[in-house]
């Protein structure tokens, strides 16, 4: 693995998973890169593995139940800084459509779900919008 790559568990197709070196995720403006500390396998990950996810395209890095440490921030991190322990909210929404304005981001007209529409967190790093981060209390291991 070089400085520009990371390890990720890639679902190539139903029932076929490979541990691969993949490029580090880009960190666009308004995003943070998070180094994974822990992930949880969700029922939707199992459905994807079995080929029962209608929304997922292959290959895909699964995983949307994530906890990690901020490794890089592009832009104003607001209350977040490099080194903060965070949990990651899985829905990436536009913030502007009718559903988003009613705080129903899961119904966003442009909804992207980590590990379904975009690369997830069963990898060393994931890149997510800063607004999708939730700070983990420092007292929590």
Language model features with spans:
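Short N-terminal binding/cap micro-motifs at the start of the first secondary-structure element
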Residues: 15-19, 43-44
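Intrinsic-disorder/low-complexity, polar/charged segments enriched in Ser/Thr/Lys/Arg/Asp/Glu/Gln
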Residues: 5, 17, 31-33
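Cytochrome P450 core scaffold surrounding the K-helix E-X-X-R motif
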Residues: 44-50
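NAD(P)H dinucleotide-binding glycine-rich loop of Rossmann-like/cofactor-binding domains
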Residues: 94-141
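Short Gly/Pro-enriched turn/cap motifs at secondary-structure boundaries
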Residues: 12, 24, 57-63, 114-118, ...
């Amino acid at each position: 693995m070089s400085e520009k790559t990371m390890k990720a568990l890639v679902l190539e197709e139903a029932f076929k998973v490979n541990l691969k070196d993949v490029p580090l995720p880009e960190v666009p403006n308004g995003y943070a890169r998070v180094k994974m500390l822990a992930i949880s396998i969700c029922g939707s990950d199992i459905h994807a593995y079995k080929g029962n996810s209608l929304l997922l395209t292959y290959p895909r890095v699964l995983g949307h139940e994530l906890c990690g440490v901020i490794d890089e921030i592009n832009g104003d991190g607001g209350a977040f800084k490099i080194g903060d322990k965070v949990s990651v909210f899985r829905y990436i929404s536009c913030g502007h459509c009718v559903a988003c304005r009613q705080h129903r981001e899961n119904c966003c007209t442009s909804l992207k779900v980590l590990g379904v529409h975009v690369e997830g967190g069963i990898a060393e790093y994931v890149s997510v919008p800063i607004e999708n981060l939730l700070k983990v209390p420092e007292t929590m291991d």
